């Protein structure tokens, strides 16, 4: 088939790579897609040459600047390891290769081969240049008795002196450790040792080391702004993050100095992806734009730093904010922010209209929309079925007194249409949104902050005959002024539609949403997706070879997560960062998420388990997915269960290809090391919990991988990409509370009577913090042009296993079918919770999306 190959025969290879300067952020904003030559012309000017090894044309890669050596998967040297072939160099630039991606360049290379070498299974590569490059892929053609071999690389390669061991890449085959070709075993083991490192020293830019550390870099002790160290203690338990090894602060030897955050080099794509424009935008926002906003408000000497009316709020996207010329000129050149901040050429800054206000300007004020967003909004997984009355607390009464709810049956039954509380409990029609226990322990401290005046809230909701929810009562609690241990001071507010009572009701709903906004950002979003996933990403890279089937299954679901989390530590969740500036808990924000993590349960992250735990579903073998939903028209749950089922089916089919028995799971040394470390180190503060899967059965493996995939994809999409569509109207989702409900006889009460809108606006997030909040959530809610969605892969040939590829294709087809079902449900007028008074169809779990602010799309990973 391949003819006769004698000694001296050569194997042709094609190497695809991208030079560093193509991936430079500022350069990308002004170049086309023509690869190195085009880039050199566009950036440097024709004929310009840089010294010191900086790349300016494709010829820089030729000569003896990049070498490669094949490693045999079938023939060994004298030590029993795969034979290493002769060192060869890139030979020819292939500028017109049709399969090239944007800004990629291809080169030919020829390897000497004879029959005694066998089939290649890996290769070494050396970079002799000063600058690194991004190695995309390598393809070997016409291997005798084998055909084509592909290597999917996607990795930065630095100068060879940066590495203690040669950079190695493995063929795109899949092997359990026990099935690895013997000649490759040593190389497989060594590569994992390199990725684990030795746990010492400060990490450098070129490092590829994955290790664990606590969150000891959020504060700035030397600047007088310390924060508790999260992780490593029973007081402040937390998932681990990537170790950086930075210098410690003078004031606190256990805290790291703030500054640039290391992430393993291949986690930081530089600016290879357009998604990096979005992450860079967050950084620009933190460092450049927020100070400019502050300056603008000061310079303009706005009547106050307040909105004066609801129309004033809507002007943010209907008319825009006029900014001083010098302010706008400083924002405009920042490439990452050009799309985020649109201007009309007249020094006006304009936000895009949020979806929640596109059809109806006042729909957000209705009780139906308030209740609908509890099950179809951006935080749809906190509501619980009420199973006892009155609601009780789990807080220690010796510390916080009696936190039992003061809501009475009589108050609820006013709006229950003749149904009693007992009847509603027995027929599963009462629900609660309960933030009492999350906020009460922090409320005394929060309310001592300069502008915070907040409550802990409980909201009771009733399931109506038409399938919608309506709020029956809101309880607003604050700590007793003489001590937390005396219990709360509480008021109960009931629905009202007229007069001052309707304003008080609107303010009570605002206080609920302020609780909900803070909890959503800190727990539902940051903790339950970003933070809990990072340890699994670290453990996967440390213990599962790229040849391992579970690595190939999970790797796409970690894409950019460590990178965005590092950026969050630097600009979002750090001391005096964006989150502390714009959300109620302020400096106690991340500490609050630590207290919630104490009760985090890995197995409850599976959607069916979560729904059952919250009382929103009952196990029923005859029902779809084995669950009967208590609220039948629960958009997040209905769509989510279909996505969960598709994920679990795909994971089951894939895992079954490699693990036919429980024994296969137990005997997989890499898999066992991975799981042990993810639990005992990555989530070390919870390692003794009995609920951790033991990783002894195929079901343990399938369930655990399904939870990881679900959390990284659909769960994150559900709590992230609706942030601007719902929260872009600060009236709908305020983030700060600055006033308690005014008492009768006070000037604030009189203002509330005379000017309800002004009273509302003086209670919620003011103008400066609104600008910060909207700027951030707009970036977070966007999809990049090159987003990779669930059921897709960056590389179609991600494995050579045809059965795995077929199963993956079925997974994609199933997800496409679910999209059609979602669209059909959104068109069904009987399902009122799908669109609500604001006429916003629930599409957050619609798998595919276009670029931008779309209110839909499930990316594979937590990449923003």
UniProtKB/Swiss-Prot annotation:
EC number: 1.13.11.58
Record's GO cellular component terms: cytoplasm
Signal sequence region: none
Cofactor: how bound: Binds 1 Fe cation per subunit. Iron is tightly bound.
Keyword terms: Cytoplasm, Dioxygenase, Fatty acid biosynthesis, Fatty acid metabolism, Iron, Lipid biosynthesis, Lipid metabolism, Metal-binding, Oxidoreductase, Oxylipin biosynthesis
Tissue: Germinated cotyledons.
Binding site for Fe cation: 525, 530, 716, 720, 864
One Pfam family named in its UniProt record: Lipoxygenase
Function as written in the Swiss-Prot or TrEMBL entry: Plant lipoxygenase may be involved in a number of diverse aspects of plant physiology including growth and development, pest resistance, and senescence or responses to wounding. It catalyzes the hydroperoxidation of lipids containing a cis,cis-1,4-pentadiene structure.
Family: Belongs to the lipoxygenase family.
Protein name from the UniProt record: Seed linoleate 9S-lipoxygenase
């Amino acid at each position: 088939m391949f003819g006769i190959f004698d000694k001296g025969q050569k194997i042709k290879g094609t190497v695809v790579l991208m030079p560093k300067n193509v991936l430079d952020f500022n350069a990308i904003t002004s170049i086309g897609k023509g690869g190195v030559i085009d880039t050199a012309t566009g950036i440097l000017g024709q004929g310009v040459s840089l010294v010191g090894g900086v790349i300016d044309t494709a010829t820089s890669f030729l000569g003896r600047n990049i070498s490669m050596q094949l490693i045999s998967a079938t023939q060994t040297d004298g030590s029993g390891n795969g034979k290493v072939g002769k060192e060869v160099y890139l030979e020819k630039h292939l500028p017109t290769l049709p399969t090239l991606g944007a800004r990629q360049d291809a080169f030919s290379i020829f390897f000497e081969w004879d029959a005694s070498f066998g089939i290649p299974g890996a290769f070494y590569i050396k970079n002799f240049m000063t600058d690194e490059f991004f190695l995309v892929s390598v393809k070997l053609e016409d291997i005798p008795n084998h055909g084509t071999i592909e290597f999917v690389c996607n990795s930065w390669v630095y100068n060879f002196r940066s590495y203690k061991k040669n950079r190695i890449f493995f063929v795109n085959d899949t092997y359990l450790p026990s099935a690895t070709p013997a000649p490759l075993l040593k190389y497989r083991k060594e590569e994992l040792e390199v990725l684990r490192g030795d746990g010492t020293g400060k990490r450098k830019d070129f490092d590829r080391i994955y290790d664990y550390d606590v969150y000891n870099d959020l504060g700035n002790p030397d600047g007088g702004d310390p924060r508790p160290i999260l992780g490593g203690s029973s007081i402040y338990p937390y998932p681990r993050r990537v170790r950086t090894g930075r210098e410690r602060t003078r004031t606190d030897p256990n805290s790291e100095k703030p500054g640039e955050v290391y992430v393993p080099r291949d986690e930081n794509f530089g600016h290879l992806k357009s998604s990096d424009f979005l992450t860079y935008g967050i950084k620009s926002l933190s460092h450049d734009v927020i100070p400019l906003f502050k300056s603008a408000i000061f310079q303009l000497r706005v009547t106050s730093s307040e909105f004066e009316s609801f129309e004033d709020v809507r002007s943010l996207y209907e008319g825009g904010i006029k900014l001083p010329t010098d302010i706008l000129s400083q924002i405009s050149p920042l490439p990452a922010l050009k799309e985020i901040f649109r201007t009309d050429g007249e020094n006006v800054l304009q936000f895009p209209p949020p979806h929640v206000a596109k059809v109806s300007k006042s729909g957000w004020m209705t009780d139906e929309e308030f209740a609908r967003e509890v099950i179809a909004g951006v935080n749809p997984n906190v509501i619980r079925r009420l199973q006892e009355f009155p609601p009780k607390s789990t807080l220690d009464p010796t510390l916080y007194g009696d936190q039992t709810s003061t809501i009475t049956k009589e108050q609820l039954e006013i709006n229950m249409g003749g149904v009693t509380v007992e009847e509603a409990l027995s027929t599963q029609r009462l629900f609660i949104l309960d933030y009492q226990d999350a906020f009460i322990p922090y409320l005394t401290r929060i309310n001592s902050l300069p502008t915070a005046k907040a409550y802990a809230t409980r909201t009771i909701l009733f399931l109506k005959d038409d399938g919608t929810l309506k709020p029956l009562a809101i309880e607003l609690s604050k700590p007793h002024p003489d001590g937390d241990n005396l219990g709360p001071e509480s008021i109960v507010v009931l629905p009202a539609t007229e007069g001052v009572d309707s304003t008080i009701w609107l303010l009570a709903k605002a206080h609920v949403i302020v609780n909900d906004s803070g909890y959503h950002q800190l727990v539902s979003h940051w903790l339950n997706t970003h933070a809990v996933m990072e340890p699994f990403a670290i453990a996967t890279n440390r213990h599962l070879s790229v040849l391992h089937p579970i690595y190939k299954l999970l790797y796409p679901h970690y894409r950019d997560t460590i990178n965005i989390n590092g950026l969050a530590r630097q600009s979002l969740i750090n001391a005096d960062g964006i989150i502390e500036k714009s959300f109620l808990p302020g400096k106690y924000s991340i500490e609050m998420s630590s207290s919630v993590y104490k009760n985090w349960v890995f197995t409850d992250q599976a959607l069916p388990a979560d729904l059952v735990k919250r009382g929103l579903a009952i196990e029923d073998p005859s029902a779809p997915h084995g669950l009967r939903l208590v609220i039948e028209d629960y958009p997040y749950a209905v769509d989510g269960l279909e996505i969960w089922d598709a994920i679990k089916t795909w994971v089951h089919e894939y895992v079954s290809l490699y693990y036919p028995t429980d024994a296969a799971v137990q005997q997989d040394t890499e898999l066992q090391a991975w799981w042990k470390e993810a639990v005992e180190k990555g989530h070390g503060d919870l390692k003794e919990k009995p609920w951790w899967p033991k990783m002894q059965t195929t079901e343990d493996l399938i369930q655990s991988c399904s939870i990881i995939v679900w959390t990284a994809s659909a769960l994150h999409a559900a709590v992230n990409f609706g942030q601007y569509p719902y929260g872009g109207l600060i009236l709908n989702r305020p983030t700060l509370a600055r006033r308690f409900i005014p008492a009768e006889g006070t000037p604030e009460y009189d203002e509330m009577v005379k000017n309800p809108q002004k009273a509302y606006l003086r209670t919620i997030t003011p103008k400066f913090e609104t600008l910060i909040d909207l700027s951030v959530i707009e970036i977070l809610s966007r999809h990049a042009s090159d987003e990779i969605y669930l059921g897709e892969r960056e590389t179609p040939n991600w494995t050579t296993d045809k059965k795995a590829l077929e199963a993956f294709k079925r997974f994609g087809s199933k997800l496409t079918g679910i999209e059609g079902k979602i669209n059909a449900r959104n068109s069904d007028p009987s399902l009122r919770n799908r669109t609500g008074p604001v006429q916003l169809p629930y599409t957050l779990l619609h798998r595919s999306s276009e670029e931008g602010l779309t209110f839909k799309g499930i990316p594979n990973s937590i990449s923003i």
